[in-house]
Amino acid sequence: KESSAASDVYKRQGIAAGLATCGKVPFISSFAMFAAGRNFEQVRNSIGYPHLNVKIGATHAGISVGEDGATHQCLEDIALMRTIPGMVVINPADDVEARAAVHAAYDHVGPVYLRFGRLPVPVFNDEATYKFEIGKGIVLKEGKDVTIFATGLCVNETVEAEKMLAKDGIDAEIINIHTIKPIDRELVVKSALKTGKVVTVEEHSVIGGLGSAVCDVLCEEAPTKVLKIGVNAVSY
């Protein structure tokens, strides 16, 4: 009833920023294309710049939206959200990590962008022992030949790909970067220096996403050859 009354008074008006100024911790949710794309100016000016404690749950991100088509396949949201000062950007890999990320987002003081896909993915984290920390990547497998940084649903795909690489004698280090901003700079540099070769895998444009975040770090601290696997948004 209260929600209905509010919608009658505030038709098509966002009130999350206002609630945050009153000490509430609002969570808003929509398709990533709308949460990050259509709403970018409002997120930037009403939430990001005043650093309000609003959490954005963006669903149906990436190309796995499938039959909803290109208009709903958001491949730019990470790039957009990374540019907003103080915005934390999290892209969980499975159900266990998603639950933990939501709790961590609630505890964090400041704006958080949580990126979720549409498709079900295999659960590979153990809920009883899993620990989530914003800004800390997770080494899923150590290796010496190449480092593969993955995020979101691409983490499970990367774990499977590693098994194929192993058959070819390639010892790959697999790292789950669930927090793209702030990225785990120490882990990125350490692993890149260890293997000397880096691959990034994401369900996002290769411009402005995980690959770009990794390259930003390595360009400054440990220049390394990087192959970015994602969606090529342009052909030139």
Identify what each model region corresponds to.
Residues 7, 27, 196-200:
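Short, structured active-site "lid" loops
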Residues 10, 44-47, 215:
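Conserved protein kinase catalytic domain
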Residues 11-13, 36, 95-98, 179-184:
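Short acidic loop-to-helix transition motifs that present clustered carboxylates
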Residues 13-14, 41-44, 99, 103, ...:
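Amphipathic, non-transmembrane alpha-helical secondary structure
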Residues 18-147, 156, 172:
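Conserved thiamine diphosphate
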Residues 1-6, 10:
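Single conserved hydrophobic/aromatic residue that forms the stacking wall/gate
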Residues 4, 52, 85, 193, ...:
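Structured loop/turn residues at beta-strand edges in well-structured enzyme cores
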Residues 65-66, 117-236:
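Thiamine diphosphate
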